[in-house]
Regions:
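N-terminal leader/targeting pre-sequences
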Residues: 2-191
C-alpha cells in the first residue's frame, strides 16, 4: 500500500507543478528579481493569486531608471536569459492578440504598461490583473519580466512597432519569474 501511494504521488507531481490540476483555493505567489542588462536598472516584481479564477496582484519596485520618465514593463515569453534580456523572446501572447495597455480590451497577457519614475529614477507600481495567471497552461511561471528604456505607447500610435512591442525601446533589466513562499511586499526604494 505504501508503495502504491508513493507511485501515485510521483505520477501526480508533474500535473500539480504546472498548476493545471491545483485546487481552486490554493493561493500562489511568485517573485522576479530584475537584474541590469547594460544599465543600472534593478528591482523586484511580486505576484500573488488567491485562486485560479481570481485576478493576480502585481507589485513592482524598480530603481536606476531615467528620472521623471515612463518605462515599459512586460512579461516575456521565455525565462531564458542566457544572453541577457535579448533571449527572453517576445511579449507573452498566448492568445495571439495585438499589443495594448494593461487595461485594454485587446492586449498581450504580458502587457503591464509603464513604470513612472520619480526624480531619483525609482518607480513603484501596484495593481491587479485579470489576464496574468500563476496557474494552468498560460501560467507566467518560468517566463520573464523585462523593463524597457522608453515609454510603452500601449499600441496607440502609428509607429511600426506599436502593435507588437509598444515601441518601448531597449531592454534594460530582466529576471525570471519563480514560485515564492509568500507575497513579498516591495516597498518603494529610498535613495
Amino acid at each position: 500500500m505504501r508503495r502504491f501511494l508513493t507511485l501515485l504521488a510521483a505520477a501526480s507531481a508533474p500535473t500539480l507543478m504546472d498548476g493545471a490540476s491545483a485546487p481552486p483555493d490554493t493561493r500562489r505567489h511568485a517573485i522576479c528579481i530584475l537584474y541590469p542588462d547594460n544599465s543600472t536598472v534593478r528591482g523586484m516584481v511580486s505576484f500573488s493569486q488567491d485562486s485560479i479564477t481570481s485576478p493576480t496582484k502585481i507589485a513592482c519596485s524598480v530603481r536606476g531608471l531615467n528620472p521623471n520618465g515612463k518605462h515599459g514593463i512586460h512579461i516575456h515569453q521565455f525565462g531564458d536569459l542566457s544572453e541577457g534580456c535579448a533571449t527572453a523572446g517576445p511579449h507573452f501572447n498566448p492568445h495571439n492578440k495585438k499589443h495594448g495597455g494593461p487595461f485594454s480590451e485587446e492586449r498581450h497577457v504580458g502587457d503591464l504598461g509603464n513604470l513612472t519614475s520619480d526624480p531619483f529614477g525609482s518607480a513603484y507600481l501596484c495593481f491587479a490583473d485579470k489576464q496574468v495567471s500563476l496557474y494552468g497552461e498560460h501560467s507566467i511561471l518560468g517566463r520573464s519580466v523585462v523593463v524597457h528604456a522608453k515609454e510603452d505607447d500601449l499600441g496607440r500610435t502609428d509607429h511600426p512597432d506599436s502593435k507588437t512591442t509598444g515601441n518601448s525601446g531597449a531592454r534594460v533589466a530582466c529576471g525570471v519569474i519563480g514560485l515564492s513562499k509568500d507575497f513579498k511586499i516591495v516597498p518603494p526604494f529610498s535613495d
